[in-house]
């Protein structure tokens, strides 16, 4: 009988340890990547601010060339929406919705997919760089809120 009690106590300690570790894990995650281009700011803004050439720049398409993309709402600007569906389990289905756009400064998309977390956002920030500010530095930042990690 004492062996059973020891086993139950050990199991409770392991469960408590997992809960404590889960409480101390970060509640949010941010991933950022920057690239610099010599394209004009207006071209960069048009390319990232609409879904007409989404296949040319988004990584989802390179992971699954047969992905199905469907747009709705306005062609560009706030409210434009792209829904995707893939047969690959790692991609699945979801959507990108443009929620904020400041020309020449930033574009913010709200993401909805099967991945863990809430309030998923993809923010593109534009900054003029180089001699005479002819280049554009594009910083893509993905943020997600995991809440309680238990």
Whereabouts are the PLM-identified features?
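Beta-strand/loop substructures that line and gate deep hydrophobic ligand-binding cavities in soluble
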Residues: 2, 28, 110-150
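Amphipathic repeat-derived elements
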Residues: 2-23, 92-109
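Hydrophobic ligand-binding cavity/cleft-lining segments
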Residues: 6-75
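Intrinsic-disorder/low-complexity, polar/charged segments enriched in Ser/Thr/Lys/Arg/Asp/Glu/Gln
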Residues: 28-36, 66, 81, 93, ...
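Hydrophobic pocket/interface hotspot
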Residues: 43-54, 82, 98, 109, ...
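Tryptophan-centered motif/residue detector
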Residues: 57-60, 84, 140
